[in-house]
């Protein structure tokens, strides 16, 4: 009995969309798109009209032989038992579609909206390979998926860009393996000798119909990764598989690339061809990994098993590459990127020493900014320069500034031309055959895109400098508000002090003739008044306030400047023109046709000129930003000095106020004591009024040298002093209220400040 019949679903009803996949649907499921067509089946996207749920349905489009029906059903069996984030997941077939088509059941799978890897590679901007972040993401995802399949004793056998789909999950692109129609379950036999699949990515042993193992997937995977790096397959990619097979099979085990010269000679290499987009620190381990994956000998391919872990060496090396901690630093003084492999627990200071050796900028003058404008924390390790899970120099950058410079000279020399591009720039009218011209123009497009991306990175560095400036400015505003608040509090205290001391001096003068007097105290109070006038100089911060306001105006103008926004529109337009030219060239038949490169060279020259212009504007604007930042740095210590002066004046005023209060209370104590003594003397005199000996007669010289007791206060004088003290206490209450209001005003100042100009 056929395996399809064992499943039991009824045959498809007549006229449903799945018969020939016309526009239509099954019940609430509407067909929205045709996703792909394989050797036997179609894959279409269906969407539920009510819930919006989407599912990819694979249906058979041909009448199959018994053998192929078994293979079809075998794929469904494999899909249903797999569960891995990098292998496309099988779903339950919707009830409305649960029927047979061409005597086999349907396969329902999760829908991945990002298209396949071939679609990504075919984009003209990727004609010389993908970005490093994309390559490393693919390496991680597909490597993990292949390991999972092999651990479950499944060989895919047909790995190719068309069978890798992309899905956006939470803003991160995930790669998934699809189409297990050719997969071989090793439980059916450890080796297999039959295969019909895509030849360009096929392992050599499959050409020769030899026995094979899991290492056939290594060859296909290595070929895919090479293509993602370089933009083309590694071995004579322009030739048909059966042609290059004979020329390549005697290659050295370490050869990972072969190209055909104009004279027909095949040139082998152990290195990746230029241009590509991967960092120099990754190139060597990546070449070593490709040498393992592209070994012609299936027994040696993958490097065998590691004796300690019993894992394939190729996957251990892959994990090593993916776990490298590399910090990429854009030197804004030279527009050059320097990369460093971080050591475990490396300190930031040690990294800065390495940066000094590479760039010549001393550690003391280095300012390392993240994209957010935050300066790296010297107390934290150097690993703060990288983000876990984020790989590739095109994804994350640290920006290096020289604090000893505020004027950055620019623009700098543009990136160097490749040998091929330089060839057509030197003579744009030279006629080249179309196949060769495609390669040259691909590198030209890569060069134009590179110029635009160089500008974009420098603009991001300028933006980091602006964000850093705004952080400094926010700190300046905070310190200014503290200074103004402290100045206002000091002014209020000094006003109170002047008013109270003037009143004290007036009242002291009023009672001095008949009350208590002290020349020493009077002199001290007058000195206090003069000292308070001197303290008032500390509250004068107008000159600083003027400088700060002028600087604020300058910063706002820089924010409003058109150079604060990206100026790459012209380069983007030129990039699109270069891409369009390349597209037109690819549509031309390659046979016996020649063409020149006049139009492409014009675009290259215009892009270089445009980049030169926008970089000149960028570095001019950057120099102004750094100039403003330096002004803030210069102002901050002046504000600190002003705050310290205000604090010292405040302390001095409080000490004088306390000293005067203590003296007043001392006077009050004396007055009260004298009042009590006088009352006792008066009572005693009244009791002995008839006794002459008890009568005290002042000496004749008292007019010039009064007896000490002559300054003793009368009861009425004591009451006057009590009034003075009460009045001083009233002033003290008023002063406390003024201080409280000043504190509340300070607390509200930051909240109510208009920050809109910072946006």
UniProtKB/Swiss-Prot annotation:
What residues make up the catalytic site?
158
Regions of biased composition (Polar residues) lie at 691-703
GO annotation terms (biological process):
cellular response to tumor necrosis factor; positive regulation of canonical NF-kappaB signal transduction; positive regulation of transcription by RNA polymerase II; toll-like receptor signaling pathway; tumor necrosis factor-mediated signaling pathway
Q: Which keywords does UniProt give here? A: ATP-binding, Cytoplasm, Kinase, Nucleotide-binding, Nucleus, Phosphoprotein, Serine/threonine-protein kinase, Transferase
* GO MF assignments: ATP binding; IkappaB kinase activity; protein heterodimerization activity; protein homodimerization activity; protein serine/threonine kinase activity
Q: Looking at the record, which segments are called Disordered?
A: 1-20, 691-715
Lineage top rank: taxon: Eukaryota
On whether Transferase is a keyword of this UniProt record, the answer is yes
Q: Which residues cross the membrane?
A: none
Q: Which reaction does it catalyse?
A: L-seryl-[I-kappa-B protein] + ATP = O-phospho-L-seryl-[I-kappa-B protein] + ADP + H(+)
- Tell me where in or outside the cell this protein is found: Cytoplasm; Nucleus
Protein EC: 2.7.11.10
Cite the Gene3D superfamilies for this sequence.
1.20.1270.250, 6.10.250.2110, Phosphatidylinositol 3-kinase Catalytic Subunit, Chain A, domain 1 (3.10.20.90), Transferase(Phosphotransferase) domain 1 (1.10.510.10)
Q: Pfam families given for it? A: IKBKB_SDD, IKKbetaNEMObind, Pkinase
The name this protein carries in UniProt is: Inhibitor of nuclear factor kappa-B kinase subunit alpha
Q: Which organism is it from?
A: Gallus gallus
Q: By which gene is this protein encoded? A: CHUK
């Amino acid at each position: 009995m056929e395996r399809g019949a064992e499943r039991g679903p009824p045959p498809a009803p007549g006229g449903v969309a799945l018969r020939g996949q016309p526009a239509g649907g099954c019940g609430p499921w509407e067909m929205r798109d045709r996703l792909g067509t394989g050797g036997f089946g179609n894959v279409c996207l269906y969407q539920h009209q009510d819930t919006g749920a989407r599912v990819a349905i694979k249906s058979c489009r041909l009448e199959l032989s018994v053998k192929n029906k078994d293979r079809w059903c075998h794929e469904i069996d494999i899909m249903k038992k797999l569960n891995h984030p990098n292998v496309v997941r099988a779903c339950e077939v919707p009830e409305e579609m649960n029927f047979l088509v061409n005597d086999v059941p349907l396969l329902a799978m999760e829908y991945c909206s990002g298209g396949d890897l071939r679609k990504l590679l075919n984009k003209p901007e990727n004609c010389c390979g993908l970005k490093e972040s994309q390559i490393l993401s693919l390496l991680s995802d597909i490597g993990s998926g292949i390991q999972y399949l092999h651990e479950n004793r499944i060989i895919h056998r047909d790995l190719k860009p068309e069978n890798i789909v992309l899905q956006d999950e939470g803003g991160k692109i995930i790669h998934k393996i699809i189409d297990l129609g050719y997969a071989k379950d090793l439980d059916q036999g450890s080796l297999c000798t039959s295969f019909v699949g895509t030849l360009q990515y096929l392992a050599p042993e499959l050409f020769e119909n030899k026995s094979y193992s899991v290492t056939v997937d290594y060859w296909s995977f290595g070929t895919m990764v090479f293509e993602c790096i370089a933009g083309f397959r590694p071995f004579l990619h322009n030739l048909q598989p059966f042609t290059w097979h004979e020329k390549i099979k005697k290659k050295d085990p370490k050869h990972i690339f072969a190209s055909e010269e104009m004279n027909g000679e095949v040139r082998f290499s152990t290195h990746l061809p230029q241009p590509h987009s991967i960092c120099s620190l990754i190139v060597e381990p990546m070449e070593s990994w490709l040498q393992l994956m592209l070994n012609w000998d299936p027994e040696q391919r993958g490097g065998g098993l590691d004796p300690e872990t019993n894992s394939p060496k190729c996957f251990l090396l892959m994990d090593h590459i993916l776990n490298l901690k590399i910090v990429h630093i854009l030197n804004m003084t030279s527009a050059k990127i320097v990369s460093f492999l971080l050591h475990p627990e490396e300190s930031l200071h040690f990294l800065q020493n390495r940066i000094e050796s590479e760039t010549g900028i001393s550690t003391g003058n280095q300012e390392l900014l993240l994209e957010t404008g935050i300066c790296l924390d010297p107390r934290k390790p150097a690993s703060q320069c990288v983000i876990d899970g984020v790989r590739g120099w095109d994804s994350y950058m640290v920006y290096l500034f020289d604090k000893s410079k505020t004027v950055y000279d620019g623009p700098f020399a543009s990136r160097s031309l490749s040998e091929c591009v330089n060839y057509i720039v030197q003579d744009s009218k030279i006629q080249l055959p179309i196949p060769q011209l495609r390669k040259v123009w691909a590198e030209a497009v890569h060069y134009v895109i590179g110029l635009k991306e160089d500008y974009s990175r420098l603009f991001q560095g300028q933006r980091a400098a602006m964000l850093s400036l705004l952080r400094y400015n926010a700190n300046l505003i905070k310190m200014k508000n503290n200074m103004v608040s402290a100045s206002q509090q000091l002014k209020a205290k000094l006003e109170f002090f002047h008013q109270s001391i003037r009143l004290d001096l007036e009242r002291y003068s009023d009672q001095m003739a008949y009350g208590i007097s002290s020349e020493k105290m009077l002199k001290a109070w007058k000195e206090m008044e003069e000292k308070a006038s001197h303290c008032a100089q500390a509250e004068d911060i107008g000159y600083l306030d003027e400088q700060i306001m002028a600087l604020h105006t300058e910063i706002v103008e820089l924010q409003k400047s058109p150079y604060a926004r990206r100026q790459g529109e012209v380069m983007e337009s030129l990039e699109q023109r270069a891409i369009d030219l390349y597209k037109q060239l690819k549509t031309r038949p390659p046979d016996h046709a020649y063409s020149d490169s006049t139009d492409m060279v014009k675009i290259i020259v215009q892009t270089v000129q445009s980049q030169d212009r926008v970089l000149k504007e960028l570095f001019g604007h950057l120099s102004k930003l750094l100039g403003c930042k330096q002004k803030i740095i210069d102002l901050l210590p002046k504000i600190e000095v002003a705050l310290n002066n205000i604090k010292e004046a405040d302390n001095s005023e409080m000490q004088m106020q306390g000293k005067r209060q203590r003296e007043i209370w001392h006077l009050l104590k004396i007055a009260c004591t004298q009042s009590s003594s006088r009352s006792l003397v008066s009572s005693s005199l009244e009791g002995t009024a008839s006794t002459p000996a008890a009568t005290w007669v002042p000496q004749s010289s008292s007019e010039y040298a009064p007896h000490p007791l002559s300054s003793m206060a009368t009861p009425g004088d004591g009451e006057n002093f009590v009034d003075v003290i009460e009045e001083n206490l009233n002033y003290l209450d008023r002063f406390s209220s003024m201080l409280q209001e000043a504190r509340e005003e300070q607390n509200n100042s930051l909240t109510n400040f208009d920050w809109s100009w910072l946006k």
